[in-house]
Every structure is written in C-alpha cells, then in structure tokens.
From Swiss-Prot:
InterPro entries: P-loop_NTPase, Small_GTP-bd, Small_GTPase, Small_GTPase_Rho. It is a peripheral membrane protein. This is Rac-like GTP-binding protein RAC13. GTP binds at residues 13-20, 60-64, 118-121. Belongs to the small GTPase superfamily. Rho family. CDD domains: Rop_like. One of its GO terms (biological process) is actin filament organization. It comes from the Eukaryota. Its main location: cytoplasm. Could participate in a signal transduction pathway that controls cytoskeletal organization. Inactive GDP-bound Rho GTPases reside in the cytosol, are found in a complex with Rho GDP-dissociation inhibitors (Rho GDIs), and are released from the GDI protein in order to translocate to membranes upon activation. Keywords: Cytoplasm, GTP-binding, Lipoprotein, Membrane, Methylation, Nucleotide-binding, Prenylation.
Length: 196
C-alpha cells in the first residue's frame, strides 16, 4: 500500500476577502457568521482525487499588512497557492497583481497559482450593492483577464456562504499540485560564428 502524497495548499490574498471562510466552508460545511481575522488552524485531511489518495494540508495566511514579514514563512514547501480576491472589491482585485503576485514570485516563484474570486453570492445581490455603495462587482471576464495577466493555472469563482464551487476550488488545487504545468521554455538564441 502506497502512502498518500502530501500537498501543501496555501491561501493568500487581502484581509477580509473570505480566505478563512472558504477554508471553514470546505472543511466543515459551515459558514462562519462573524468576521474574525485568520482563526483557521492548519488543517490536514486525506482526499481521494481521480482514484488517488492525497493528504491535503491547508494553510491560512493573514492578508493584513501587519503580517507582511511573517506571512512568507508559510510559503516554504508550498505545492499550490489559492490566490483570492473578493468579487465585490476592486481594491482586492488590483492587489492581486500589485502586491500578491510580486510577493509570491519573490518567495516561491515556481509554485502554481489557482486564482479564486470569492463572495460570488454578493456580486449580483442588488440589496447588498445598494447598502454598500463602495462595493464594485468584478465580472467573470475580468477574472479571466486577470488569470491570463498573472499566469495563473485556472480561475474559479465561489461562494463560501452558499458553498457554490467551494469543492471545485480545492479539487482544482489538488489537480494542479499533482500535475503542475510545465514551465514555458524560453526560445534558445542561436549563436552564430563569424570566421574572419
């Protein structure tokens, strides 16, 4: 009997985008109603994907700037990153390429990224958008465009509250970690010799 392969999956993104809620929703099928910054403990579970058992280790990180020095310590040994932004926050969307991709490429440049748009249930919630005039909905096409811009392997939108696509996020992360994309090879420059 072979031992299960361990996959370290690290969630990254701005504070309050829903990283912890997504992890709690996935691991316990419940949605926390109160916002408590980064209270999720590291979690490990055996998961069967495509007939193979993997031990999935989930690591939560704090997005707040107070943790800029500590957060990268959790990146070591990561097999895949879940890079999250809120589908109702333009600032969190822009920080994907302004802050998070530069940080991930600096500390873990070869680790694949799954881009995740969270709070899908609120994007089309007219009452929420009326009550929160600062909320700016991000479209699916904007998410796909961002995926291409940052070189993410895939893009998934989810709602931790309704659990829509939450399992799909983690299934994608596992599949990406098991079969990471081949790095793009740079074309070789042909060297020419000139005999004089």
């Amino acid at each position: 009997m072979s031992t299960a392969r361990f996959i370290k999956c690290v969630t990254v993104g701005d504070g309050a985008v829903g990283k912890t809620c997504m992890l709690i929703s996935y691991t316990s099928n419940t949605f926390p109603t109160d916002y408590v910054p980064t209270v999720f403990d590291n979690f490990s579970a055996n998961v069967v994907v495509d007939g193979s058992t993997v031990n999935l280790g989930l690591w939560d990180t704090a997005g707040q700037e107070d943790y800029n020095r500590l957060r990268p310590l959790s990146y070591r040994g990561a097999d895949v990153f879940l890079l999250a932004f809120s589908l109702i926050s333009k600032a969190s969307y822009e920080n994907i390429y302004k802050k998070w991709i530069p940080e991930l490429r600096h500390y873990a440049h070869n680790v694949p990224v799954v881009l995740v748009g969270t709070k899908l249930d609120l994007r089309d919630d007219k009452q929420f958008l009326i009550d929160h005039p600062g909320a700016t909905p991000i479209s699916t096409s904007q998410g796909e465009e961002l995926k291409k811009m940052i070189g993410a392997v895939t893009y998934i939108e989810c709602s931790s509250k309704t659990q829509q696509n939450v399992k799909a996020v983690f299934d994608a992360a596992i599949k990406v970690a098991l079969r990471p994309p081949k790095p793009k090879r740079k074309p070789c420059k042909r060297r020419t010799c000139a005999f004089l």
